[in-house]
């Protein structure tokens, strides 16, 4: 029997059943989130991100993630690196491209729960996409083995602007920790607390950002080494609204 492809898999799978099987806490709500991204963002995701941050802001976000991914302990030349909640691959491709110059033999993987985003990811070179939820990365990998070669563990995991879409961030941190190798690291970039409640309708946000101290305390329950910093000078600007960002570095 020929091996199925991601495209074939996405056509055949019944999404609510798969989400339930992966242990999504509220599969119905998550399916609604996925519909939001499919109908409102998938085709124009890259333009949306660019309009929020601008080229300078995007560069600062990418460079901030790279600096921490390149921090000690250094990634090996054959590192396996995963982007969780990669969306269309806007940040994945930029970070992978720069890391490839330093780690030419590294492998890059991208996980997302929106089929339309994954189809966009398939167009990105040298990145292996697969379906999954951040709360159960290990289970998502097991499912993905039917159509892609995905390792069980990674040297590094990163995410950009994904966490505020997750209902249980503690479970996400635990999920990330489970797929990191010994001495592995994770880098998470997301929004600080803000008051723009309209983001929930406009962008399908679950959380109105996070207090960096909250992130630190929650992550420390899972990771022995946690650093959370605000990213000065980087704001998400849209219609005059500005939200600060933070970057969390988590080490096993």
Stretches found by the model and what they are:
Residues 2-74, 90-94, 120, 136:
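Conserved class I S-adenosyl-L-methionine
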Residues 170-182:
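A short glycine-rich, Lys/Arg-flanked "PGG" loop and its adjoining helix->strand segment in the class I
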Residues 158:
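A conserved beta-strand element that flanks and buttresses the S-adenosyl-L-methionine
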Residues 161-162:
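Short catalytic micro-motifs in class I SAM-dependent methyltransferases
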